[in-house]
Amino acid sequence: IYACYQDREGGIWIGTYFSGVSYLSPKHKDIEWYYPNGTENSLSGNVISQFCEDPDGNIWIATEDGGLNLFDPRTKKFKNHLLRSSNPNIGYHNIHALLYNEGKLWIGSFSRGLYILDTQTGKMKNYRHNRANPHSIPNDHIYSIYQTKDGSIYLGTLSGFCRYDPESDSFRTLEPLSHIFIYDMVEDQHGDMW
């Protein structure tokens, strides 16, 4: 098991390393399996790294070998979203982290930085590490994205973690963890980050 997520209806989504997705329905108590089968509406990857849910009940699925997938539980169909680099002909497949917040999907990639997808317009913005800019993300390897109770958004990277500043549309790297690999984060009941 590589990732696990409980949706708002109580269903359990299990992401595996090379075996796709298993879903345990809370209503039927049966297991559904999803894996790439080469058709247009199937899952695009086998290495499942993260899940998140949007307000419409759709499940966003990050894979390390097939990019970003949107699963519609009503139709049981997948839609693949390739992240684009500066060259629109090159898609990127290795995604590690997801967060849905106010109509925007935050996407943490391996080696290509942070993408923010406006789910209404389809527009995407890419944030990359820039050595000349201390307010850029600290590293292009994003492993986790976390939103605290107060609405702050943090990124865990290969070189520490940072907090997003929405007013300046920039990031503040948090010391003394600026050179530590941050794989995951959680906020405790006191508002402290671990």
Residue ranges of model-derived segments:
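Carboxylate-rich, polar loop motifs that coordinate divalent cations or form catalytic acidic clusters
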Residues: 1-194
